From Swiss-Prot:
Keywords: 4Fe-4S, Cell inner membrane, Cell membrane, Electron transport, Iron, Iron-sulfur, Membrane, Metal-binding, Repeat, Translocase, Transport. Its cofactor is [4Fe-4S] cluster. Residues 369-397, 407-436 form the 4Fe-4S ferredoxin-type domain. [4Fe-4S] cluster 2 binds at C387, C416, C419, C422. Residues 605-615 have a biased composition (Low complexity). This is Ion-translocating oxidoreductase complex subunit C. Part of a membrane-bound complex that couples electron transfer with translocation of ions across the membrane. Required to maintain the reduced state of SoxR. It is a peripheral membrane protein. Binds 2 [4Fe-4S] clusters per subunit. It comes from the Bacteria. The keyword Cell membrane applies. It comes from Escherichia coli O157:H7. The lineage of its organism: Bacteria, Pseudomonadati, Pseudomonadota, Gammaproteobacteria, Enterobacterales. The keyword Plastid does not apply.
Length: 740
C-alpha cells in the first residue's frame, strides 16, 4: 500500500491557475523529418545573441575563418559566437537583427566559400572523468545558450546553480501554437537529447531528473520512452496540453508543486530547468566538440508551400530560409519570428537567424483574420482569469497608460511572462502585452538612471570626504610646522635680545663728568673713524665696480690719453708764448710736466687693467705707443726751446730718459703678454724695438746738445744715469709684480 501511494505521489502533477487552449496548428510542420538547407551566400552573425554583454572581437576584416571558429571571446557572462561556415570576413558593421524594432547591432559578415570546412574537433567522449568546472567552461566557450527563447548563457546558469539543485527539469512542453522544433528534435534525435541530459545531471548531481512533455506529442513521447527504457534515474511526466504550461514557473509548479517566489528564481527552491534543444547542444559541445552553429527552426504558415523543420545555420537571412521552403507572399504579407502569441513581426526579411529563433510563421490572411480595432476596457476580468501568473492585467494596463510606475511595480508587473493569454481573451482587442513590455522597459530605464545617480552621488560624497581628509591633513601639517623653535633657535634669539638690551642700556646710561677731569671720547672717536673707513671702503668698492662695469675700447682710451697730453703741451706752449718775458719758475714747470706724465701713465694703467681679456692688435698697440713716446719727446723739446736760458739738471734728464725707456720696454712686454697665442712677425717686432731705442738715444742726445756750454761733471752724470736706470728697472719690476 505504501509503495502504491509513493508511486502515485511520484507521478503526481499539479495544475496552475489560468491558461488558455488556442488552436494548436502543429500538424502543418511536425509530420516531416528534419532537413538541411543549402548554404546562403552571405551570413550575418550578430555579436550579441544572448542575455548579457557582447563578447570581444577576435577577427578582423579579410580573415579566413572555418566553421566553428570563435569570432568573439567569452569572458564572464559574455558568450562567444562562432562562424557558421567557412569563408572570408568581409565586414564588421552594425546590421539589423531579430528585434521588434529591427535595431542595428554590431555583426560579423562572412561570405561563404562553399566548402563548409570545420575546425579541428576535439570531443570528450569520457566526460565523466572531467571535472565539473572543466565541463562548464567548455559549454560556455562553445557558445551554448538557452534555446527555448530566453537565451541565457547555459554555463553561467549551471555555475550559479552550484550544489543546491535538487531537481533538474527538462522542458519539452513546447506549448505555443505552430511551433514544433522541439517535437521534431525529440523524434529524430532522442538518444542525443538523453545523452545531453545525462551530461547536465553529471554536472549538477541532482536528486531527481524530470522531463515534462505535453500529451499532444505522441511520437516524441514514444521515442523518449524507448530510449529511457533501461534508465531509472530519469523520469518523464506527460502533462495535459494547456497554454502556457511551457513557462518556467508554470512547468515547475506542474511537476513539483513548488512556486517560485516573487522576484526570485527557480534555483531558490532547488530547481533548475533546461530546454530540450539546449540539452542537445550540450551533447554536441562536450562529446562531439562542435560549437553551436545551427539550430532547428520551424517554417510554417499557409504562405509557405513546404512547411517543416530545418537545420538553419546561425546568421542565415530569413529570406533565404523562406525561399527554400517555397514562400509565396501575398499583399501586406507579414512574417512572425516566434509563435503567434509571444512572437513579433519582422520589419523586413534581411534579418539573420539567431540562437533564440525557433519559428518563422508566415500566415495567410485567412489564418489571422481581419485586424480588430482596439476599444476601451470594459473591466470584464477575463484577462485576470486567464493570467497564469495570478496578476491583474486590467490594473497593470491602467498603470501603464497612466505612467504610474510605482503602482505597476507594486502589482508585480515584473512577474508577467508576456505569454499573451490576456490579450487572447480580451473582448476589446487591447494589445495588453505591448503595454506591459513598454512599461517594463520604462521601469528598467528609470532604475538604470537611479543607479547612475546613486553611483554619481557616491562618487560625489567620496570626493567630499577625500577633500575633508586632505584639509584635515593640511591643517595638521600647519600645526606641526608652527611648533616652538628648537634649542639652538632659542639660544640665537636670546643672544640677539641680550645684545639689544645691552645697547639700550649703554644708550640710556647718563654721562658723568667729574670736576677737574676731561671726558674720555676715545671710543666715540674710534667708532666714528671706523664708520668713515667703512664708508670709504664702500665708496672704493663702488668705484671699482663701476670701473669694471665700464667696457671701453683700448684704442679710444689711447687716443684720449694722447689728446690729454697734447692739451697739456699746448697749454705749456701758450703760457710760454704769452709771456716770454715772464720769469717762469722751472720747478713749477717740471712739476706740471711730471703731473701730465703721471696722468698719462695712470690712464694707460686703467686701460690695461680695464680689459685684460680684450684682444688687441699688437701692431696697432706698438704704433700707438711709438706715437705717445714721440709726443712726449716733442713736449720735452718744446719745453727746452721755450726756456733756453733755464739750466737743466743732467741728473733729472737722465732719470726722465730712463723712465721713457722703461715705459717703452713695459709696453713691449704688455703687448707680448696680451696675446701670446697670436702669431707676430719677429722682423717687424725687432724693427719696432730698434726704432724705439733709436728714438730714446736721440732724445738723450738732444738733451745733451741743448746746453753744450754747461759744464757737467761726466762722472756724476754717469752715476746719476746708472742710479736712474736701476730705480726705473726696480719700479717697473715692482709694478709688474703688483699687477700680477
Amino acid at each position: 500500500m505504501l509503495k502504491l501511494f509513493s508511486a502515485f505521489r511520484k507521478n503526481k502533477i499539479w495544475d496552475f491557475n489560468g491558461g488558455i487552449h488556442p488552436p494548436e496548428m502543429k500538424t502543418q510542420s511536425n509530420g516531416t523529418p528534419l532537413r538541411q538547407v543549402p548554404l546562403a551566400q552571405r551570413f550575418v552573425i550578430p555579436l550579441k545573441q544572448h542575455i548579457g554583454a557582447e563578447g570581444e572581437l577576435c577577427v578582423s576584416v579579410g580573415d579566413k575563418v572555418l566553421r566553428g571558429q570563435p569570432l568573439t571571446r567569452g569572458r564572464g557572462k559574455m558568450l562567444p559566437v562562432h562562424a557558421p561556415t567557412s569563408g572570408t570576413v568581409t565586414a564588421i558593421a552594425p546590421h539589423s537583427t531579430a528585434h521588434p524594432s529591427a535595431l542595428a547591432e554590431l555583426s560579423v559578415i562572412i561570405d561563404a566559400d562553399g566548402e563548409d570546412c570545420w575546425i579541428p574537433r576535439d570531443g570528450w567522449a569520457d566526460y565523466r572523468s572531467r571535472r565539473r568546472e572543466e565541463l562548464i567552461e567548455r559549454i560556455h566557450q562553445f557558445g551554448v545558450a538557452g534555446l527555448g527563447g530566453a537565451g541565457f548563457p547555459t554555463g553561467v546558469k549551471l555555475q550559479g546553480g552550484g550544489d543546491k539543485i535538487e531537481t533538474l527539469i527538462i522542458n519539452a512542453a513546447e506549448c505555443e501554437p505552430y511551433i514544433t522544433a522541439d517535437d521534431r528534435l525529440m523524434q529524430d534525435c532522442a538518444a542525443q537529447v538523453v545523452e545531453g541530459i545525462r551530461i547536465l545531471a553529471h554536472i549538477l548531481q541532482p536528486r531527481e531528473i524530470l522531463i515534462g512533455i505535453e500529451d499532444n506529442k505522441p511520437q516524441a513521447i514514444s521515442m523518449l520512452r524507448a530510449v529511457l527504457a533501461d534508465s531509472h534515474d530519469i523520469s518523464m511526466r506527460v502533462i495535459p496540453t494547456k497554454y502556457p504550461s511551457g513557462g518556467a514557473k508554470q512547468l515547475t509548479y506542474i511537476l513539483t508543486g513548488k512556486q517560485v517566489p516573487h522576484g526570485g528564481r527557480s534555483s531558490d527552491i532547488g530547481v533548475l530547468m533546461q530546454n530540450v534543444g539546449t540539452a542537445y547542444a550540450v551533447k554536441r559541445a562536450v562529446i562531439d566538440g562542435e560549437p553551436i552553429t545551427e539550430r532547428v527552426v520551424t517554417l510554417t504558415g499557409e504562405a509557405i508551400a513546404r512547411p517543416g523543420n530545418v537545420w538553419a545555420r546561425l546568421g542565415t537571412p530569413v529570406r533565404h530560409l523562406l525561399n527554400d521552403a517555397g514562400f509565396c507572399p501575398s499583399a501586406d504579407q507579414m512574417v512572425i519570428m516566434g509563435g503567434p502569441l509571444m512572437g513579433f513581426t519582422l520589419p523586413w526579411l534581411d534579418v539573420p537567424v539567431v540562437k533564440i529563433t525557433n519559428c518563422l510563421l508566415a500566415p495567410s490572411a485567412n489564418e489571422l483574420g481581419e485586424p480588430q480595432e482596439e476599444q476601451s476596457c470594459i473591466r470584464c476580468s477575463a484577462c485576470a482569469d486567464a493570467c497564469p501568473a495570478d496578476l491583474l492585467p486590467q490594473q497593470l494596463y491602467w498603470f501603464s497608460k497612466g505612467q504610474q510606475h510605482d503602482k505597476a511595480t507594486t502589482h508585480n508587473i515584473a512577474d508577467c511572462i508576456e505569454c499573451g493569454a490576456c490579450a487572447w481573451v480580451c473582448p476589446s482587442n487591447i494589445p495588453l502585452v505591448q503595454y506591459f513590455r513598454q512599461e517594463k522597459a520604462e521601469i528598467a530605464a528609470i532604475r538604470q538612471e537611479e543607479k547612475r545617480a546613486a553611483e554619481a552621488k557616491a562618487r560625489f560624497e567620496a570626493r567630499l570626504a577625500r577633500l575633508e581628509r586632505e584639509k584635515a591633513a593640511r591643517l595638521e601639517r600647519h600645526k606641526s610646522a608652527a611648533v616652538q623653535p628648537a634649542a639652538k633657535d632659542k639660544d640665537a634669539i636670546a643672544a640677539a635680545l641680550a645684545r639689544v638690551k645691552e645697547k639700550q642700556a649703554q644708550a640710556t646710561q647718563p654721562i658723568v663728568i667729574k670736576a677737574g677731569e676731561r671726558p674720555d671720547n676715545s671710543a666715540i672717536i674710534a667708532a666714528r673713524e671706523a664708520r668713515k673707513a667703512q664708508a670709504r671702503a664702500k665708496q672704493a668698492e663702488l668705484q671699482q665696480t663701476n670701473d669694471a662695469a665700464t667696457v671701453t675700447d683700448p684704442r679710444k682710451t689711447a687716443v684720449e690719453a694722447a689728446i690729454a697730453r697734447a692739451k697739456a703741451r699746448k697749454l705749456e706752449q701758450q703760457q710760454a708764448n704769452a709771456e716770454p718775458e715772464q720769469q717762469v719758475d722751472p720747478r713749477k714747470a717740471a712739476v706740471e710736466a711730471a703731473i701730465a706724465r703721471a696722468k698719462a701713465r695712470k690712464l694707460e694703467q686703467q686701460q690695461a687693467n680695464a680689459e685684460p681679456e680684450q684682444q688687441v692688435d699688437p701692431r696697432k698697440a706698438a704704433v700707438e705707443a711709438a706715437i705717445a713716446r714721440a709726443k712726449a719727446r716733442k713736449l720735452e723739446q718744446q719745453q727746452a726751446n721755450a726756456e733756453p736760458e733755464e739750466p737743466v739738471d743732467p741728473r733729472k734728464a737722465a732719470v726722465e730718459a730712463a723712465i721713457t725707456r722703461a715705459k717703452a720696454r713695459k709696453l713691449e712686454q704688455q703687448q707680448a703678454n696680451a696675446e701670446p697665442e697670436e702669431q707676430v712677425d719677429p722682423r717687424k717686432a725687432a724693427v719696432a724695438a730698434a726704432i724705439a731705442r733709436a728714438k730714446a738715444r736721440k732724445l738723450e742726445q738732444q738733451q745733451a746738445n741743448a746746453e753744450p756750454e754747461e759744464q757737467v761733471d761726466p762722472r756724476k752724470a754717469a752715476v746719476a744715469a746708472a742710479i736712474a736706470r736701476v730705480q726705473a728697472k726696480k719700479a717697473v719690476q715692482q709694478k709688474v709684480v703688483n699687477e700680477d
